[in-house]
């Protein structure tokens, strides 16, 4: 689909920063802001948002159903809801078949859909052209790796967050074609999985909801794939743990090339920024955003870090910030360090330029 409308989330100030490759902004207070080389939408998110914007512009008296959040950013999702898009909650996706007409338009989010729902949708619509599929190409690459590995009889191990839409999409496809499947959300879980396999009882002490056919795991080769927004370093650490387990727990082990280029690059840029002397780092993005959460985790290892969902969460006196581990909001006062402090800014790949610009302008005014 050729773009027919301009990006509703673009901002000329951010465009100028990119054009000038400006990563440092000096403030009149003597403080300065430091940004990584890449900010704003990654390619997959930009493509998905543009598809939906074009669909809204082209729709002719047809209802548009968005099957879950387009991306994990409330500013973006709220914008499209105000444009008339009917966005379904992730827990209510099945209701689309009783609420929608077969002639409506249906938009698949950037994360993709679980396998069964995808198949039901394609059987439900009157014409294939009524489905606007914005699934990220890197997510599709994971699906393809799963299907290819399954043809060889390999079990699939997924480094992903249980319950996340993308991981659910990978999981349901793997469960359909592979002899066994396991979700491993962390390196610690990788050790836990190995400890739960023979000679102990298969599946013991490992969450059953993260396993399919656990008894078959020791008898299969293993292929590791990953949710594209996880920490790349942790995916590689999990690969090392599983590979080192050797034939004691499984057959041959391979790691699929499913690390997202944008995720890897942005995490590397975040590490580089964190290595600078930043008195405080602000991370901006949706609190349900996996890639934004990983940026927060990286930054929090280095210095005081605040996770903001909106520029409105901050002023010169206090900051309202999210704690991912505790899944709680907290209000902190006296957050602003004195001049000549450097304030680092990290931005999730689903955070629009308009939000980034609003945060920078607020800091220019209050910091």
Question: What do these predicted ranges mean?
Answer:
Residues 1-367:
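The feature marks the mature, well-folded catalytic cores of soluble enzymes
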């Amino acid at each position: 689909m050729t773009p027919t409308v301009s990006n509703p989330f673009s901002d000329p100030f951010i465009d100028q920063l990119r054009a000038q490759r400006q990563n440092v902004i000096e403030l009149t207070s003597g403080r300065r802001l430091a940004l990584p080389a890449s900010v704003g939408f990654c390619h997959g998110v930009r493509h998905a948002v543009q598809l939906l914007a074009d669909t809204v512009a082209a729709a002719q008296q047809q209802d548009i159903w968005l099957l879950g959040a387009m991306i994990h950013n409330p500013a973006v999702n709220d914008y499209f809801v105000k444009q008339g898009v009917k966005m379904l909650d992730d827990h209510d996706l099945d209701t689309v078949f009783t609420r929608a007409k077969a002639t409506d338009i249906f938009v698949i989010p950037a994360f993709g859909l679980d396998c069964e729902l995808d198949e039901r949708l394609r059987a439900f619509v009157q014409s294939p052209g009524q489905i606007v599929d914005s699934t990220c190409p890197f997510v599709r690459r994971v699906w393809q790796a799963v299907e290819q590995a399954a043809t060889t009889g390999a079990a699939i191990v997924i480094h992903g967050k249980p319950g996340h839409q993308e991981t659910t999409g990978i999981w349901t496809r793997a469960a359909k074609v592979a002899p066994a499947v396991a979700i491993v959300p962390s390196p610690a879980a990788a050790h836990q999985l190995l400890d739960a396999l023979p000679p102990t009882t298969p599946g013991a002490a490992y969450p059953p909801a993260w396993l399919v056919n656990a008894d078959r795991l020791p008898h299969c080769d293993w292929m590791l794939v990953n949710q594209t927004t996880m920490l790349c370093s942790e995916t590689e650490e999990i690969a090392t743990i599983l590979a080192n387990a050797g034939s004691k727990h499984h057959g041959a082990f391979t790691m699929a090339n499913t690390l997202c280029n944008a995720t890897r690059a942005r995490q590397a840029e975040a590490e580089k920024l964190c290595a600078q002397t930043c008195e405080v780092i602000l991370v901006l993005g949706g609190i349900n955003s996996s890639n934004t959460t990983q940026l927060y985790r990286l930054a929090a290892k280095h210095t005081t870090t605040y996770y903001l969902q909106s520029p409105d969460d901050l002023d010169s006196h206090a900051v309202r910030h999210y704690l991912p581990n505790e899944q709680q909001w907290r209000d902190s006062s006296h957050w602003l360090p004195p001049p000549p402090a450097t304030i680092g800014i990290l931005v999730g790949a689903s955070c629009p330029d308009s939000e980034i610009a609003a945060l920078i302008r607020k800091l220019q005014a209050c910091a």
